[in-house]
């Protein structure tokens, strides 16, 4: 995760702003600079290589002292920064909006995946600039649209029906902020269209999840799509979701947290996110993740008869 201000800076032109991507040498200068505390939140002028991000975001970049940040010296950083600028320059951002826009915390890996989709000649985003920019505006939280299958970050499609598409995420192969844990495995489920979904299509998805992904929890980050994650990683997801939710509220970026379909979401996660939305502390919310829940009446009782036992998945074992 990183703020948009880690990728670009605003330049006032008439009554609107044009966004310009940072270059890696300017960032490198900023990372080595001694800056007064009162100037930590201001864009840094490297003198030689142009404007750099505010020093308060130093920890967002990979250095000798911090291996958890972005690999900003890779070509992928520039591609992501340029893509963000293209999207922001396609809309009007005024002086009253610019601080709010740049403070938004975004998924770096999501943006890298959109770059990969853009470069894939077989992908619809390669052929449609309008759809590409829509996808980016959704990814950076500037659009009220939800991420659907056409505008999704992408990955490897492992399941699809008339209503849903399930993707295996490819973060292990990333350049900008790769997942280093070689045991990482995670999926994302997007709706094909933002419209009511028939019960039969929900049934098909739940049957697939029960049999092929029975070692995983179905959760949501509140953005209109589902994530299918290992139970061992749920607490980590909870920390990130809670931090992003609080950060957005603090910065005035109030975005409705979409709880999604309770029949699909893991019961404990639904309780966690509901508690978070009510304003409870992280400690109180996380207790619900490990609490034994009263099993609710199953609207799809009998689904287990839809598959033979030899079809039960070994994924995640």
Curated annotation (Swiss-Prot):
Lineage: superkingdom: Viruses
UniProt GO cellular component terms: host cell cytoplasm
Glycosyltransferase listed as a keyword: no
Positions of region (RNA-binding): 205-241
Active site: 225 (for ntpase and rtpase activities)
Location in the cell: Host cytoplasm
Annotated EC: 3.6.4.-
InterPro entries: Rota_NS35_C, Rota_NS35_N, Rotavirus_NSP2, Rotavirus_NSP2_C, Rotavirus_NSP2_N
Family, as annotated: Belongs to the rotavirus NSP2 family.
Record text on subunit structure and interactions: Homooctamer. Interacts with VP1; this interaction is weak. Interacts with NSP5; this interaction leads to up-regulation of NSP5 phosphorylation and formation of viral factories. Interacts with host DCP1A, DCP1B, DDX6, EDC4 and EIF2S1/eIF2-alpha; these interactions are probably part of the sequestration of some host SGs and PBs proteins in viral factories.
Protein name: Non-structural protein 2
Origin species: Rotavirus A (strain RVA/Cow/France/RF/1975/G6P6[1])
């Amino acid at each position: 995760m990183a703020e948009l201000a880690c990728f670009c800076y605003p330049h006032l032109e008439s009554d609107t702003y044009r966004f310009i991507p940072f270059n890696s040498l300017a960032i490198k200068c900023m990372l080595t600079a001694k800056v007064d505390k009162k100037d930590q939140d201001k864009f840094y002028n490297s003198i030689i290589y142009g404007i750099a991000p505010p020093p308060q975001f130093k920890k967002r970049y990979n250095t000798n002292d911090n291996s958890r940040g972005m690999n900003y010296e890779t070509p992928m950083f520039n591609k992501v920064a340029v893509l963000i600028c293209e999207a922001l320059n396609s809309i009007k951002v005024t002086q009253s909006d610019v601080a709010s826009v740049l403070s938004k915390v975004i998924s770096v890996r999501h943006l890298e995946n959109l770059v990969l989709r853009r470069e894939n000649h077989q992908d619809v985003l390669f052929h449609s600039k309008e759809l590409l920019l829509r996808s980016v505006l959704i990814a950076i939280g500037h659009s009220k649209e939800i991420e659907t299958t056409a505008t999704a970050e992408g990955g490897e499609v492992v399941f699809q029906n008339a209503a849903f598409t399930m993707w295996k995420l490819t973060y292990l192969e990333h350049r900008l902020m790769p997942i280093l844990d070689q045991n990482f495995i995670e999926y994302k489920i997007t709706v094909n269209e933002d419209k009511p979904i028939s019960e039969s299509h929900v049934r098909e998805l739940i049957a697939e999840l029960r049999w092929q992904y029975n070692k995983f929890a179905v959760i949501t980050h509140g953005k209109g799509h589902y994530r299918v994650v290992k139970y061992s990683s749920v607490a980590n997801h909870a920390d990130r979701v809670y931090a992003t939710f609080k950060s957005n509220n603090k910065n005035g970026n109030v975005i409705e947290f979409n709880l999604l379909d309770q029949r699909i979401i893991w019961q404990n996660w639904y309780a966690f996110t509901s508690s978070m939305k009510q304003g409870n502390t992280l400690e109180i919310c996380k207790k619900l993740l490990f609490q034994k829940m009263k099993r609710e009446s199953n609207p799809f009782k009998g689904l287990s008869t839809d598959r033979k036992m030899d079809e039960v998945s070994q994924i995640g074992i």
